[in-house]
Regions:
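Glycine-rich phosphate-binding loop of ATP-grasp-fold ATP-dependent ligases
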Residues: 125-128, 146-172, 195-198, 221-236
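Conserved N-proximal alpha/beta basic substrate-recognition cap immediately N-terminal to
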Residues: 32-48, 53-137, 141, 154-155
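A long amphipathic alpha-helix within ATP-dependent nucleotide-binding catalytic cores
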Residues: 223-279, 318, 323-324
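Short hydrophobic beta-strand that contains or immediately precedes a catalytic carboxylate
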Residues: 148, 284-285
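Phosphate-binding site of ATP-dependent enzymes
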Residues: 171-222, 269-284
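N-terminal-proximal low-complexity accessory segments that begin disordered
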Residues: 2-11, 16-36, 40-44
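Conserved ATP-binding module of the ATP-grasp superfamily
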Residues: 122, 146-149, 164-192, 252-255
Length: 325
């Protein structure tokens, strides 16, 4: 159903913070500032010229909104309760969405770790710690470059910390304790990453999936996204390409079985083995069951533009029917 001229967007790039909250959630002013800055990079790619992006602060101030957006389809970066409430507040009709607990399950890092566990030959093992005793036992193991500890939820470099092998320091113990109160930790060896990959996709209601061409991703040393570009077939080995395609299909099946449909992306990378040896593919670092910063670039039919608006129109043009649970 697409009688309206555009879509209404909530670009809640702080979604993982909301998913990790055990009670009511409100972003800090610092986080609001980051979201405000980063979402500008989605204008003209994910967000079309006729679309309207909702600004929560403007709505809270009572600033007038275009009357024409009432009844328009509403999309969110991630359809969390706050995002859906904001869409409904202005009269937009949210596109069919999963429930909160499902979003938490499929975006939590242990979900990705379980899917990866049997399909990463040659790469390292990820460990899940649910209490401090488990975490300390894992961190005490020898690791050439230390350990990367990830909280249950995190994005843009947030919710992770590099720790040396052995007994953590006082401030590190405080961070571990605070992190465990939020949920289990994923602990993995710190590795030297040679090249990062992403695959974007859309899993349909019937479980079928549309997968993008391979893309190369650049992030900061802290894991925050910088940019993504489509890569030519000769810039990735056939083995890596096939492994990433297979992993994306595997993730799509798992998401569909769990009850999710819509956009998602996976992160992967090729890293060096210990002692500076050969490189090996880690086919699944993260699952983002939502839109991503590179979804438009990856899914665009014309890679020169990085605009996936036509593709998004086709994929989201199903009848708008809200789920009842």
């Amino acid at each position: 159903m697409r009688g309206a001229a555009g879509r209404v967007w909530v670009l809640n790039l702080d979604a993982e913070s909301e998913l990790s909250a055990t009670h009511s959630y409100a972003p800090t002013q610092h986080l609001r500032t980051i979201v405000q800055r980063e979402r500008q990079r989605l204008i003209g790619t994910l967000v079309g010229p006729n679309d309207v992006v909702l600004d929560e602060e403007r709505i809270e101030r009572g600033d007038p909104l275009p009357e024409r957006i009432r009844g328009w389809p509403g999309l969110a970066w991630c359809p969390t309760p706050r995002a859906l409430a904001l869409l409904r507040r202005v009269g937009a009709v949210p596109v069919l969405t999963p429930g909160l607990e499902l979003l938490r399950t499929i975006n939590a890092r242990p979900f990705a770790a379980r899917l990866r566990s049997e399909h990463a030959p040659g790469s390292f093992e990820k460990h899940c710690a649910t209490d401090m005793e488990q975490a300390l036992a894992l961190l005490a193991r020898p690791a050439e470059s230390g350990w990367l500890v990830r909280r249950e939820f995190g994005a843009a470099g947030r919710g992770r910390r590099r720790l040396h092998s052995g007994r953590p320091g006082a401030d590190e113990l405080v961070w571990l304790q605070a992190s465990l109160r939020q949920g289990p930790l994923i602990i993995e060896p710190w590795v030297a990453i040679e090249r990062e990959y992403t695959r974007s996709a859309w899993v349909r209601r019937d479980g079928s999936v549309l997968i993008s061409e391979p893309c190369a991703q650049t992030t900061t040393e802290h894991g925050a996204w910088v940019d993504t570009e489509r890569i030519h077939a000769d810039a990735i080995t056939r083995a890596d390409d096939e492994a990433l395609e297979a992993m994306t299909e595997r993730v799509a099946r798992a998401l569909s079985v769990a009850g999710y449909h819509g956009p998602f992306g996976i992160d992967a990378y090729r890293h060096r083995l210990p002692q500076g040896g050969a490189t090996v593919l880690n086919p699944l670092s993260e699952i983002n069951a939502r839109f991503t910063m590179d979804w438009a670039t990856a899914m665009a039919r014309d890679p020169r533009t990085g605009v996936a608006l036509d593709e998004l129109h086709r994929l989201s043009a199903e009848p708008v029917i809200e789920e009842t649970t």
